[in-house]
Amino acid sequence: MKTKLRVGDKVKILCGKDRGKVGEIASIDRKKFKVTVKSCNMIKKVIKARTPQEKGKIIDKEAPMDISNVMLFSNGVISRVGIKFENNEKKRYLKKSGENV
């Protein structure tokens, strides 16, 4: 499956515990069809102490979510992404509003 989303795109989360939140894509795993959105879908990660003198920690970390659970967001509207050619260059655009991404 091919995706038209890119790192740095502003997306809205469609389902899950963070439904309705807007964030920026931090990373995309194209083989597993997962995206990581900054400060969304946070989980607690336990880090063990490496030496007896150190203490273990619990940190907050973004967990990846399925790519179908996010949609491109711009000017208060979520939309699918299309591709058109202008001057022999591929341009991404929002299908609802027609504006370039």
Curated annotation (Swiss-Prot):
Q: Give the Gene Ontology MF terms in alphabetical order.
A: rRNA binding; structural constituent of ribosome
Mind telling me which SUPFAM superfamilies this protein's record contains? Translation proteins SH3-like domain
Q: Which GO terms describe its cellular component?
A: ribonucleoprotein complex; ribosome
- What keywords does the record list, in alphabetical order? Ribonucleoprotein, Ribosomal protein, RNA-binding, rRNA-binding
> Could you give a single Gene Ontology term from the biological process aspect?
translation
Disulfide bonds listed in the record: none
Per the entry, what this protein does is: One of two assembly initiator proteins, it binds directly to the 5'-end of the 23S rRNA, where it nucleates assembly of the 50S subunit.
Q: Which family does it belong to?
A: Belongs to the universal ribosomal protein uL24 family.
Q: Which PANTHER family match?
A: MITOCHONDRIAL RIBOSOMAL PROTEIN L24 (PTHR12903)
Subunit text:
Part of the 50S ribosomal subunit.
Task: List the protein's name.
Answer: Large ribosomal subunit protein uL24
What would be the name of the gene that encodes this protein? rplX
